[in-house]
Amino acid sequence: MQNIRIAAMIFRSVSGDVRRNLNAMVHWIKISKNEGAHIICFPELNITGYSNLKEIKNAAEPVPGPITQDLSNLSESQEIVILAGIVEKDDKGHIFSSHLVIKPDGFVGVYRKLHIAPPEQDIFTPGNTIPLFDARGVKFGIQLCYDAHFPELSTHMAIKGADLIFIPHASPRGTPEEKYRSWMRHLTARAFDNGLFIIACNQTGENDKGLRFPGIAVIIGPSGNIIKKILSNKERLVLADLKSEDLDRVREHRMRYFLPNRRPELYDFS
């Protein structure tokens, strides 16, 4: 991978108010660009807002569509890669919790959440593919919130060549400190066991549908070390420089990079 500056956003989304959320994104994208960021990651469903109520379907849009066009124009003008969450509706009427990858050259990619938490299963359809994306000299995967609790997904992405995994969340309830303790039970292990960077961020504040989100953003190194974190109930931007030498230091060490010594012929997950 190449050295890269990443921005992760603690962001307040109002459920169903797409225009308001997009306008707020513009502000932070411009700040990120001025700070030298190459990629900015927003939380899960930050554009449409998060809700496990069926009314959230009213905010669903196709991909590509008007939202992706707006973001493509913004990505091109600011010369920054944008990762952002949307309720997506396909041509068969299926509803997905999706995360967009918008590049300045016009590329529009999409990751559809694979593992749907029980309270969301009446609304969202699970995705069925595990895409990886290339941007600014790095290869990365995306997982959305509940996805991160399935460790084999991170290992799959690492084996397929991911240097980092973005894990946007829309995870309500609790304080930022409580959410941080919860994330540290598994996110550091995803980074350490697979020798890659993890970038995780959450929504914050009230969403106008009865949910409150504890603001948190964490960037974790391939040794499982915390590179940077912010806990805040206000919108905040977390910036970090991810260095190829930190990744190489782990992956070239025979006792710190575990994946080459896997025994997949012994594992039966069926």
Question: Language-model segments: which ranges?
Answer:
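Short beta->alpha transition motifs characteristic of CBS
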Residues: 48, 100, 111-117, 218, ...
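Active-site catalytic loop in hydrolytic enzyme cores
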Residues: 90-167, 172-185, 249-258, 266
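Short polar catalytic/cofactor-binding loops
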Residues: 10-16
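Cys-nucleophile CN-hydrolase/nitrilase-fold catalytic domain and related Cys-dependent amidase chemistry
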Residues: 18, 27-104, 172-189, 193-196
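Short, acidic/polar
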Residues: 20-29, 150-155
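CN hydrolase (nitrilase-like) catalytic-core segments centered on the catalytic cysteine
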Residues: 66-83, 149-237
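Extreme N-terminal starter segment of soluble prokaryotic enzymes
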Residues: 2-8
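Short beta-strand-to-turn element immediately C-terminal to the catalytic PLP-Schiff-base lysine
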Residues: 101-103, 220-221, 240-241
